[in-house]
Curated annotation (Swiss-Prot):
Enzyme Commission code: 3.6.4.13
Top enzyme class: hydrolase
Localization (cell): Cytoplasm; Nucleus
Protein name: ATP-dependent RNA helicase TDRD9
């Protein structure tokens, strides 16, 4: 069993009370060890005199101390400094020397091994030094990660026996445990950086300790730059201490050098030597006796770093050898008289990424007898899985931790004895061509590998095994990693540079420790202009600089990605601030949706459920967060146990959603400083307002994520229909590569998809199978979630396996009967009734006997499912007579109660009462079981009702065979309009009410267009005072619907029906009856199939001995996406598997209009060949929406026209062009759109008007947002919302047009200035730093 961790153990992890070997503190110069490959600076007495400034005068010192004094609140007193006994650590011996060095030098650099006491003890030395002299001080210590800052602060507070937040505290992001009396505070690097950029001085602190400086993150390097600048300008008396276990001392010392006697003198360097326990190092060529036979030591090459299968085997063999090593050590200890039991030391394996962790975990799982407990440690694993790392293993078991570089410094596991290091790391880099981020495997630096080595030897002697040769280590492994500032986007840093206001970005960043490449700075400036944080037209007229806009000032104060910050601001403009704050908080932290490795489908299903039929991860986050927040507010989750249970049921990680809630509150406070507040009326409750708000939110999301736009790829309908053999893509998936006699294992196929949903039928055809899922609700019409779950399964499990009997074995048991023709015969399996039937060669999807006698016939509409979708029955004399006979036959019988338990799709007899008449019984099917009641569907009429379960009766067997009289109908060539899609879930409430008013409970005339998947697609006509009216035309005229083409399969069916009815009318139609011999052959085949099933599926038969690998599931209607910008040309687009849209099925491939997907995160694969999208939203399929959204949110736009300039054909959107070079400013992000609907000058004018309204809510100056009243803000928000809705809902709708791309594709400045009308806002100088410039309009020849 897992054992709990005590507080004493946790304390023990930081400073183990053990003796240290070979401890030496020195200030004498000496050469570094060969393995470190770095020269260390150790200063002698003369160097010390040069490095130390002259002694300050007493009055100067008093001024410094006064500036550092903390404010005190009224009625409170600062906590006392308890006497403290320092633990025996390497750094303790020279306490006074260190204090003296720090007090006499502006900057001191300290290097010491992990566990030497730098972080925990040195700040306390200074704290006690000042306390003894009764001099105020204020110390801040930075840590690169939250977990480090919080845990160290807790440990120091506990050691000093003070309350956390009094004398000692911490601040990590939004979480702060400190008061005005706190004298020692641990913070993350970003927290201190934000404070310094805002205050532009260091004087809030007396001492600044910057820890782990070797990591060289972008934030850390910029912090060093800011500290250095301020130290030399207005904060000369503040002391700065840089600390690390592995640091290039010379580089840092020279960077912080100070001018003394007309020369630059490097900062003072002090080294602490010593480690808790010795750690022995071994390289691959020193492990020959422990390696598997045949391992090639020259496998790893610097040009292509990766892990081969052989190297995985080496690591596994090493782990197995530890038992023998420990047994030898135990025997030696017994000979010396020790009686301790051998303990199996924990193993920490460093791997570059999650894929490698999973591979290694799979390899270790084969060692079933080795008693291993394997824990993955990666940023994506759930918190529950992470906690297992710190648990004490079960006695007799060995703990194996498979970790990325997160365990280098963020997480310390104390009982690690062995470290296995592949010397690889997956580093975030910025692609030079696209500027997208990508994670690439590369060789870790020596400094990182030495940090990893330090993870062992905390409680006993340690061992480090580097899986490279010593020669490779010495000659190929780099000494230091490339600073993040040289390989990552610089957007956040550049905004802080602009806030510092100390010069243009290029000149400021040129003073960094390792200055970024000039081209990277220039590119980032352009991207800030693109996002709207810098003005597109700078007053300085410099292309690579710009004035900070109001949006830029807001973004610089928000601890979120810049696009998420823009989302918050746009959310305020359009009245959906609360939702945007939730999204920004959710996407800034680890996802609170649990996707555990063993329950991926359950997590995906939960996310789909929260999305509420909207294909958007953002909507799922909003709905899940609100569901949790509302439940807590109502007191439903008052007890932690109830909350955890709710989280488990909904696949929500409670701890993480709480963190999102904290960040949500923090962001809400931050934006309130800019006069942005959540409106009390921003939570609509009625159906129309709810969907209107949802649409506005989707547009706002798209606006914030410009230019991360992707369009849905087209599907060849004809090929897709052929591949799916005419089955419904909304309910069916395809399995390939099936073995002979595959119908014998249909139950295995069914069980493979049991987690996805209820399988209705399986159709075998050759080596393929078509698995159809059951539609549990007659009111559903879209792609089933079951289909999406099955397709997702194929992403997690690439290959499916079936246990099958060999074909020869099957034929042998046929006892001489010829069955070779059954190997790949067409077979249909009804899973519900477990009937297996062969399919005839002449089988057709259209049965003439079941067709109406004429294409035009009268029906009675009994149940409206949705607009244009309803159930009814024919009212001709023959049909009515059949219904009467069935009803009479049922109600004359003595019907028996049901003898079986209720289940969905059970055929039965149910009562129905029409008006005042007595209830009668009718044939019915169970839909849903609702406690003691049940919802039933009357199969001869098409309506549904809820009746008591006890009222159901058994359907007599002889009355099961007559065909059901009810028929499902859909109106052909009609789809929802933009108005319906925006104001409802496909259809608005007004459209639904109008359709019900027109059709419910009345007779109507229908004209049969086609029959598709059992549904009659018809033209519906009703009688009015003015005559017969087409319902579709009426709904189109009223703006509820639009005309749309039918699918390829529907068109095919239409042609078949037209031909069939023409033949019937002319007397040429001849019914095709199968011959007696064919019917006999079919019956024989059915008997043979049943005999084979009876033999091979019975419990007494031998188990299958063969394993068949089948391919799938798949769907030819699965959607692919491609980038709308130039940056992703010739790269495939992949959506991350945790996204709702990672598998999408196009249910309307006949609609050729462009559909847009937006993504919050766009990155490159390691190879650079694929674009990876994370957190996506598929926009509603409104014709012209991609063009409208792009034109609305692009910084600059140039309209395209036809040759005669009589109409607009498209637009080029992006950052515009350089007036000198005439080239595009940021060509890789330009988007060329070709209009598929007709846009007029009035539409462009409306876009400009909306951009102007946005500007009035996102600007500085006397008329800026900070100076507006809440009434004025609400008025402008309502104006923006109404303009937005009016832009997308145009009556009459914009006519279709064929897209025409410009012959000078993505070329700017093609419009003559004389043919262009420049649009200028009325600027009285009271609005500054606006977000958008207005688009010029190209004049047309009318």
């Amino acid at each position: 069993m897992h054992q709990a961790i005590t507080s004493a153990q946790i304390a023990h992890w930081f400073t183990v009370g053990a003796q240290f070997a070979n401890i030496r503190i020195t200030n004498e110069a000496k050469k570094a060890e060969a393995e470190d490959n770095a020269t260390e600076v150790r200063s002698d007495k003369a160097f010390s005199e040069l490095s130390s400034p002259e002694k300050e005068k007493s009055d100067d010192g008093n001024q410094r101390r006064k500036r550092a004094q903390l404010p005190t609140g009224p009625g409170t007193s600062p906590p006392s400094l308890a006497s403290y006994e320092y633990p025996i650590l390497p750094i303790t011996k020279n306490r006074q020397e260190l204090v003296s060095l720090i007090e006499n030098n502006s900057v001191v650099i300290i290097r010491g091994a992990t566990g030497s006491g730098k972080t925990t003890q040195l700040p306390q030395f200074i704290l006690d030094h000042y306390a003894e002299r009764n001099i105020p001080c204020n110390l801040v210590v930075t840590q690169p990660r939250k977990i480090g800052a919080t845990s160290i602060a807790r440990w120091v507070a506990r050691e000093r026996k003070c309350t956390l937040g009094s004398l000692v505290g911490y601040q990590v992001g939004l979480e702060k445990m400190a008061t005005e009396h706190t004298k020692l505070i641990y913070v993350t690097t970003g927290v201190l950086l934000q404070k310094l950029v805002s205050s532009k001085t260091l004087t809030e602190y007396s001492h600044i300790f910057i820890d782990e400086v070797h990591e060289r993150s972008e934030e850390l390097d910029f912090l060093l730059l800011v500290v250095r600048k301020l130290l030399r300008s207005n904060s000369r008396y503040v002391k700065v201490i840089l600390m690390s276990a592995t640091i290039n001392c010379i580089e840092f010392a020279e960077y912080f050098g100070s001018p003394i006697r007309n020369q630059m003198n490097p900062a003072y360097v002090f080294e602490v030597e010593g480690a808790p326990y010795a750690v022995e190092e071994y390289y691959l060529d020193e492990l020959k006796t422990m390696l598997p036979v045949g391992v090639n030591l020259d496998l790893t090459l610097p040009q292509d770093p990766y892990i081969t299968e052989e190297m995985y085997n080496v690591a596994v063999s090493l782990i197995q050898s530890f038992d023998e090593m420990e047994a030898k050590d135990h025997r030696r200890s017994e000979q010396t008289g020790s009686t301790t039991h051998p303990e199996r030391g924990s193993v920490l394996v460093f791997l570059p990424g999650l894929a490698e962790i999973q591979y290694m975990k799979e390899a270790l799982s084969k060692l079933v007898r080795k008693r291993l407990q394997v824990y993955p440690l990666h940023s994506t694993v759930t918190l529950e899985e992470q906690n297992g790392v710190f648990l004490v293993p079960v006695p007799g078991y060995r703990k194996i931790i498979l970790s990325t570089n997160i365990a280098e410094s963020s997480v310390t596991v104390p009982d690690v004895k062995y470290v296995i290091d592949f010397c690889l790391v997956r580093q975030l880099a910025c692609d030079k061509e696209t500027n997208y981020r990508c994670l690439r495997i590369t060789w870790a630096s020596k400094t990182s590998c030495n940090q990893r080595r330090g993870r062992a030897g905390r409680v006993s002697k340690g061992f480090c095994y580097r899986l490279v040769t010593r020669h490779f280590w010495e000659n190929e492994i780099p000494n230091f990693s490339i600073p993040e500032m040289l390989r990552s986007p610089l957007a956040s840093t550049l905004l802080k540079v602009k806030l510092l206001d100390m010069g243009d970005p290029r000149s400021v960043l040129s003073t960094a420790l390792t200055p970024p490449i000039l081209g990277d700075i220039e590119r980032t400036v352009l991207q800030l202009k693109q996002i709207g944080a810098l003005s597109v037209q700078s007053n300085s007229q410099r292309q690579f600089d710009g004035d900070l806009t109001f949006l830029g000032r807001v973004l610089a104060q928000l601890p979120v990605d810049l696009q998420l910050g823009k989302l918050i601001v746009l959310g305020h403009v359009f009245g959906c601030l609360e939702e945007c704050l939730i999204i920004a908080a959710s996407l800034s932290l680890k996802s609170f949706f649990a996707m555990p490795s063993l329950q991926q489908l359950a997590g995906y299903r939960s996310k789909l459920s929260f999305a509420q039929n909207v294909p958007s991860d953002f909507i799922a986050y909003v709905n899940a967060f609100k569901a949790w927040y509302t439940s807590r507010a109502k007191g439903e989750l008052r007890h932690p146990k109830d909350e955890l249970e709710w989280g488990k049921e909904n696949c929500i990680q409670i701890k993480r959603i709480r963190e999102v809630a904290e960040l949500f509150e923090d962001l809400k406070k931050r934006v309130s400083r800019f006069n942005m507040h959540i409106s009390s009326s921003s939570n609509p409750t009625d159906y129309t307002s709810l969907h209107k708000q949802r649409f506005i939110l989707q547009v706002v999301i798209a606006g914030a994520l410009f230019p991360n736009y992707f369009s849905q790829g087209e599907i060849d309908e004809q090929l897709a229909s052929k591949e799916l053999s005419g089955n419904d893509p909304k309910t069916t998936i395809l399995i390939r590569n099936l073995p002979p006699f595959a119908f014998l294992c249909y139950k295995q196929l069914q069980s493979l998809f049991r987690q996805c949903g209820q399988v209705k039928s399986i159709a075998f055809d050759g080596s393929r199978a078509y698995v159809e899922f059951h539609r549990s609700c007659v009111r559903e019409s879209g792609v089933l979630h079951e289909v999406l779950l099955a397709l997702l399964r194929s992403r997690h499990t690439p290959a499916l396996h079936l246990q099958v009997h060999h074909a020869d074995e099957v034929e042998f048991h046929a006892k001489g009967k010829p069955i070779a023709h059954l190997r790949y015969t067409r077979v249909n399996v009804d899973v519900q009734s477990h009937t297996v039937s062969p399919v005839g060669v002449l089988s057709s999807s259209v049965n003439p006997e079941k067709l109406p006698t004429s294409r035009d016939f009268v029906i009675n509409i009994t149940e409206v499912i949705d607009v244009g979708h309803f159930w009814g029955f024919q009212t001709d004399e023959n049909s009515v007579e059949k219904q009467c006979q069935l009803t009479a036959a049922l109600n004359m019988r003595d019907l028996r109660p049901l003898s079986v338990s209720l289940y969905p799709n059970l055929l039965c007899v149910a009562p129905f009462k029409d008006g005042q008449q007595m209830a009668k019984y009718y044939r019915a099917k169970v839909l849903h079981i609702l406690g003691s009641n049940v919802e039933v569907f009357f199969v001869d009429f098409g309506n549904t009702t809820v009746v008591p379960s006890s009222s159901l009766r058994e359907l007599p067997s002889d009355l099961m065979t007559p065909a059901f009289q009810a028929q499902e109908f859909c109106i052909a060539r009609m789809a929802p309009s933009a108005q319906s899609l925006i104001l409802g879930d496909r259809w608005s409430s007004r459209a639904r009410n109008r359709f019900k008013t027109l059709t419910s409970g009345r007779s109507a005339i229908v004209s049969l267009f086609s029959i598709l998947h059992g549904v009659m697609r018809v033209d519906l006509h009703i009688s009015t005072e003015t005559g017969d009216v087409s319902v579709a035309d009426l709904l189109v005229q009223e703006g509820h619907a639009c005309h749309t083409p039918e699918s390829f399969e529907s068109q095919q069916s239409h042609e078949v029906l037209i031909s069939l009815y023409e033949d019937m009318a002319s007397g040429r139609f001849t019914p095709s009856f199968a011959s007696g011999s064919l019917n006999s052959r079919m019956e024989e085949d059915k008997q043979l199939i049943n005999q084979l099933l009876l033999h091979f599926c019975s419990s007494g038969s031998s188990a299958p001995k063969c394993k068949a690998v089948v391919h799938g599931p798949s769907s030819p209607h699965k959607v692919n996406f491609h980038s709308m910008s130039k940056v992703s040309n010739f790269r495939s687009v992949n959506i991350e598997r945790d996204s709702i849209n990672c598998v999408m099925v196009n249910e309307n491939p006949q609609d050729w209009h462009e559909r847009m997907l937006v993504a919050a995160s766009v990155s490159l694969s390691a190879s650079g060949s694929r674009i990876l999208l994370k957190e996506t939203s598929l926009m509603p399929h409104i014709h012209g929406l991609p063009s409208l959204v792009t034109m609305l949110f692009t910084p600059v736009m140039e309209l395209r026209t036809n040759e005669d300039r009589t109409c607009f054909t498209g637009a080029l959107c992006g950052l515009g062009w350089n007036s000198v070079s005439q080239e595009a400013v940021l060509p890789e992000h330009d988007i060329e759109i070709a209009f598929d609907v007709k846009f007029e000058i009035e539409d462009i004018t409306e876009i400009n008007a909306l951009r102007g309204t946005v500007n009035r809510l996102v600007c500085d100056g006397p008329n800026g947002l900070l100076n507006l009243s809440q009434e004025k803000i609400s008025s402008l928000q309502e104006e923006a919302r109404e303009r937005l809705i009016r832009l997308f809902i145009k009556t009459p709708s914009r006519p279709e047009c064929t897209p025409v791309y410009h012959d000078k594709f993505k070329k700017w400045n093609l419009v003559d200035r004389s043919q262009q009308m420049e649009i200028q806002e009325k600027d009285d100088g009271k609005s500054k730093g606006v977000l958008f410039q207005l688009h010029p309009i190209t004049l047309l020849n009318m």
